[in-house]
Amino acid sequence: MHNIHRRHFLKAAGAVTAGLVTANIALNANASSVAPKPRVGKSVIGLIAPKMELVRVGFIGVGERGFSHVEQFCHLEGVELKAICDTHQAVIDRAVEHIVNQNRPKPAVYTGNDLSYRELLNRDDIDIVIISTPWEWHAPMAIDTMESGKHAFVEVPLALTVEECWQLVDTAERTQKNCMMMENVNYGREELMVLNMVRQGVFGELLHGEAAYIHELRWQMKEIDHKTGSWRTYWHTKRNGNLYPTHGLGPISQYMNINRGDRFDYLTSMSSPALGRTLYAKREFPADHERNQLKYINGDMSTSLIKTVKGRTIMVQHDTTTPRPYSRHNLIQGTNGVFAGFPNRIAVEHGGFGKSYHEWDMDMQKWYDKYDHPLWQRIGKEAEINGGHGGMDFVMLWRMVYCLRNGEALDQDVYDGAAWSVVNILSEQSLNNRSNSVNFPDFTRGAWKHATPLGIVGA
């Protein structure tokens, strides 16, 4: 989306969001204490769309993230890239050129204003839409996509308010269309191996998980006129909480079968002082630069604790400001042992190749040899060649297309996207109420109690 439009929309969205948050806290800090609205359709847990011989794809947003999806789809069989939409001509031209250079038909192009995507949605030769736009557009575009009779696949996070989460759930249930937040980290090799190990009982009964998005991104503040930093920077002036919870939380949630036998119950959150971006702006920009006029309020480190209905605990952290190595934690603790990421290491009481659980086993190869996930065994080499965050992007898109072409349910649904994304809002609500706990809405309306647990997905 064009930067001028982004800024205007973001300012308006920020004002609305601030009002909604204030109202929510004033009226009721516990977001789920009010009973959910009656379901207007039927649950989409396990939704299976009619088989598609070819998956016809439209793209809304082909900038940095969107273009990477265009690249990956060009590697996939059984897909047609029908149309693209963006408000920035340079990224449109790049995407069209790449598609044509891959010996695929030239896609239709939609541009001109922020609502041009609706022209793309009016087409009757598109099955799914890939949405890779600034965060504030995710929910509105996904809702419009489902209303147009198409399946929505949305970049993270899925939504920015509790009400948006409910609107997405209600629309998916009423239209019986998929709305999948594309949490690519769930398809990383390590994450899928751990899922396999969890399902085989290697760690025993699960007790605790730790998730994070710790990724120093201050350099994005220098992206002024376009690219991610041109709009993402402003969120650090709008909210104080976990702005981006899903990369770490998605895999932990699937290990624990959240929304499929357990669910998030309540959350408490704290944030550190917000110092790093102000200091960075003073160091890297002239005194009169806009970046030095902004008031950064989002704490450099956000830490939330989640309690599940079954009593399990999850720590979720967010830090894109301080100078430190990248981490998503990816820790899962059970009664028989633990896996922790960054760096990968394992300690188990029984079944640990003779190594004591009092010390970490850092040699992953023997664990891969025994527990490497079926998806990576099948397409891992192809994923590594095609890239995309170490191959996880390719595996995710391959799996999406496989499910659609073979009449299988997707691995992530609208309830997952809503539950993982709503941590953004609830962490802010808790923080603004002296870190008192805030209840999670039950977006499944009780269906989590009887939903089939996610298995060791394969192909």
Curated annotation (Swiss-Prot):
Q: Which InterPro entries does the entry link to?
A: Gfo/Idh/MocA-like_OxRdtase_N, Gfo/Idh/MocA_oxidrdct_glycsds, Glyco_hydro_109_C, NAD(P)-bd_dom_sf, TAT_signal, TAT_signal_bac_arc
| Leader sequence segment | 1-31
Q: How is it modified after translation?
A: Predicted to be exported by the Tat system. The position of the signal peptide cleavage has not been experimentally proven.
* Residue positions binding substrate: Y213, R232, Y244, P245, T246, H247, Y326
Q: Which GO terms describe its molecular function?
A: hydrolase activity, acting on glycosyl bonds; nucleotide binding
Q: Does Cell inner membrane show up as a keyword for this record?
A: no
Q: Which residues bind NAD(+)?
A: E64, R65, D86, W135, E136, W137, H138, E155, V156, N184, Y244
Q: What class of enzyme is it?
A: hydrolase
Q: How is the cofactor bound?
A: Binds 1 NAD(+) per subunit. The NAD(+) cannot dissociate.
Q: What is its EC number?
A: 3.2.1.-
Specify the superkingdom: Bacteria
| Cofactor or coenzyme needed | NAD(+)
* Alphabetical UniProt keywords: Glycosidase, Hydrolase, NAD, Signal
Q: One Pfam family this chain carries?
A: GFO_IDH_MocA
Q: Which family does it belong to?
A: Belongs to the Gfo/Idh/MocA family. Glycosyl hydrolase 109 subfamily.
The UniProt function text for this chain reads: Glycosidase.
Q: What is the protein name given in its UniProt record?
A: Glycosyl hydrolase family 109 protein 1
Q: What is the species of this protein?
A: Shewanella sp. (strain MR-4)
Question: What lineage is this protein's organism placed in?
Answer: Bacteria, Pseudomonadati, Pseudomonadota, Gammaproteobacteria, Alteromonadales
